[in-house]
Amino acid sequence: MMQESGTETKSNGSAIQNGSSGGNHLLECGSLREGRSNGETPAVDVGTADLAHVQQQQQALQVARQLLLQQQQQQQVSGLKSPKRNDKQPALQVPVSVAMMTPQVITPQQMQQILQQQVLSPQQLQVLLQQQQALMLQQQQLQEFYKKQQEQLQLQLLQQHAGKQPKEQQQVATQQLAFQQQLLQMQQLQQQHLLSLQRQGLLTIQPGQPALPLQPLTQGMIPTELQQLWKEVTSAHTTEETTGNNHSSLDLTTTCVSSSAPSKTSLIMNPHASTNGQLSVHTPKRESLSHEEHPHSHPLYGHGVCKWPGCEAVCEDFQSFLKHLNSEHALDDRSTAQCRVQMQVVQQLELQLAKDKERLQAMMTHLHVKSTEPKTAPQPLNLVSSVTLSKSASEASPQSLPHTPTTPTAPITPATQGPSVITTTSMHTVGPIRRRYSDKYNVPISSDIAQNQEFYKNAEVRPPFTYASLIRQAILESPEKQLTLNEIYNWFTRMFAYFRRNAATWKNAVRHNLSLHKCFVRVENVKGAVWTVDEVEFQKRRPQKISGNPSLIKNMQTSHAYCTPLNAALQASMAENSIPLYTTASMGNPTLGNLASAIREELNGAMEHTNSNESDSSPGRSPLQAVHPVHVKEEPLDPEEAEGPLSLVTTANHSPDFDHDRDYEDEPVNEDME
């Protein structure tokens, strides 16, 4: 009997030392904090209240252990003195689970394996936190109950030595059995919790595994810190505020550190991927690629340079970059401050992006609504219905203009007999078109430059004027109304920041305009060659000279602002509807070409075919026609576009905006001309 008692006592002692059901995190926190204080310097200070609470819990558990050891020693001594009572000792022994007394330590290597297997989502963290808190409450209640039972058992043992009745011994035995059942239930709950963690791929620790010595915690994580992280998840409004604490429970929640949870290996343990919480901010989704699969890809490494903000250290290879990252950008106050600054930068950029998107949406909405407002015009004498025009355009190519509503304007046809001609619709054209609104909308160049002088001087924005208009303005602003070529160059660079670069291109264009336009006259004087402006000749080369009915002129000017060329789809629809003068075949027909020439003569449209106007970068032709006796003076076609005869207006395919906006730096063919 004595041998059996001794054997069971040893088994109980071994069970106390080697049991492995869940761990007491409070005791573990105390022991690990002691190890941290004795060994490594702690990465983060712990509050005095938390430390005092942990020390109290540790002392209470140590006292409980001492009481158990004393009880076992007393039982052994009593067993030696009174061998008759040894048969009753097994019923009075209280098996204690290591789950209640010995903490289960999760080493950094094990936590790394856990995180590589699966990354918890915020919802899973919430569930695990609730389970952990419930287990902690049950564990504390069980510890208190265990202490009370130990005291009662000690009293009962004293009474038993005094010679009590067998009924009381049976009651003690039943209480002992009930207590054992509660301990077993607690063990089962903890085992189920561990099994659930294993099923979720979060825990791969074998039972009875001894705790390894504490290692540096700058790249590790202990269960107590994980528990603290879970508590912060419940207290925070968003789960993003706490994921940056995972290196060594660094408290960055006050500055909303968020971003160490996107990838599978980027939470805590992997120094190659975590980079002190400096991954993509506010991205809760998981990334399928890990740095183990692609060892040479890293957000902070590119082209042999460290991309850490403010670093830009040159690293020969990826391994040297990792060494540099772990040495120079370890978890310290400087790296933490840089991380906070980067977060603020990202937040400001996101805010600015949201504002710019809202502004862009408002601009698009405004322009869309404005373009759909129809412009009124006098009732024409003979025209194709604008409704039919818009309908045919939409039927011909429903996808060609998805966001460009058409606004047909009323065309103007001559009073003489001839084929009906329609005007173009207001559609947004696609292409490198620069609008010269000073010429189209009758905005004087002098007033525009005066109003936006500071803007043009500081912003590298191309001025919305032709080179000829700018040269004329430069000459007119001079006191003597004449400038040398170098003085014209200086005026361009002084007035516009845009011309302070690419000097070879625009200076070549200026020389071409001076040489090829008749309105610019070269005069020889004592200073050398100077350039002046022939104002009469300059006014001749303007796109339109309209005289006649004032109301008609007003309507034409209003409609001019909304006229753009037809696209290919609209031309095809007109060809199907047999609309003359707008199909490619009809344009190539000599009979229709002669008819168009006769119509132009009846309208007194004078065409200027000069070398000056062939190279002109001034505003192009207007697609509007004039009613007799309105006189329309128009620019000629460019050489590459003068293949077919003109229609009543100019040509069917002609884009007034495009030719009007054409400048010499866009035509390298002419740049060799002097």
UniProtKB/Swiss-Prot annotation:
Top-rank taxon: Eukaryota
Compositionally biased residues, Acidic residues: 664-674
Residue segments, region CTBP1-binding: 380-384
Span of zinc fingers (C2H2-type): 304-329
Main location: nucleus
Keyword Transcription regulation annotated: yes
SMART domains in alphabetical order: FH
Cross-referenced InterPro entries: FH_FOXP1_P2 (IPR047412), Fork_head_dom (IPR001766), FOXP (IPR050998), FOXP-CC (IPR032354), TF_fork_head_CS_2 (IPR030456), WH-like_DNA-bd_sf (IPR036388), WH_DNA-bd_sf (IPR036390)
Compartments where found: Nucleus
Modification sites for Phosphothreonine: T650
Record note on quaternary structure: Forms homodimers and heterodimers with FOXP2 and FOXP4. Dimerization is required for DNA-binding. Self-associates. Interacts with CTBP1. Interacts with NCOR2 and AR. Interacts with FOXP2. Interacts with TBR1. Interacts with AURKA; this interaction facilitates the phosphorylation of FOXP1, which suppresses the expression of FBXL7. Interacts with ZMYM2.
Protein name: Forkhead box protein P1
Gene name of the record: FOXP1
